Amino acid sequence: MDMGSKEVLMESPPDYSTGPRSQFRIPCCPVHLKRLLIVVVVVVLVVVVIVGALLMGLHMSQKHTEMVLEMSIGGAPETQKRLALSEHTDTIATFSIGSTGIVLYDYQRLLTAYKPAPGTYCYIMKMAPESIPSLEALARKFKNFQAKSSTPTSKLGQEEGHSAGSDSDSSGRDLAFLGLAVSTLCGELPLYYI
């Protein structure tokens, strides 16, 4: 055996590792431009994340609002379909029932008014403070009442002795007990008490 060959085997193996680690290099760019580029990229990413979060929040709040409105109008059977009487006795709430009409709750006077979409008449109904009807129940009641339009109805302000053809609005009656909201909704339309 040749001694020279043993020396070759005793040498350390060649180093195949990479050279010293250097910074991220962009050719032809000075250091201050690299830093500026990194700052701009970080700011853009932060803005994209914030805008995305805001848009998701807006979408979720819109879906939540639509779900609550859908449940209150024609929603799930497990939800409570009654409106609670507000702490404020002078609160008025107005709802549009699709294209069929407008419902107005007057919690101070405990009245519910309904004006159909064509706007030829206005229905008024008294509500009990412990049992305020839901929009769905009111819509059903008013639709049933409209379907039975051949039945005689009592105009508000008419007495039993007056004929059905007399104009009740020109009789000089005071409708202040209805309140400003109901008077504004119904205007000069004939009022029917249900």
UniProtKB/Swiss-Prot annotation:
GO annotations of cellular component type: alveolar lamellar body; cytoplasm; extracellular region; extracellular space; multivesicular body
InterPro entries attached to this UniProt entry: BRICHOS_dom, SP-C, SP-C_palmitoylation_site, Surfactant_protein_propep
UniProt key word Lipoprotein: yes
Chief place where the protein resides: secreted
Keywords: Disulfide bond, Gaseous exchange, Lipoprotein, Palmitate, Secreted, Surface film
Subcellular location: Secreted, Extracellular space, Surface film
Gene Ontology molecular-function annotations: identical protein binding
Function per UniProt: Pulmonary surfactant associated proteins promote alveolar stability by lowering the surface tension at the air-liquid interface in the peripheral air spaces.
Extra facts: Pulmonary surfactant consists of 90% lipid and 10% protein. There are 4 surfactant-associated proteins: 2 collagenous, carbohydrate-binding glycoproteins (SP-A and SP-D) and 2 small hydrophobic proteins (SP-B and SP-C).
Protein name: Surfactant protein C
Source organism (scientific name): Rattus norvegicus (Rat)
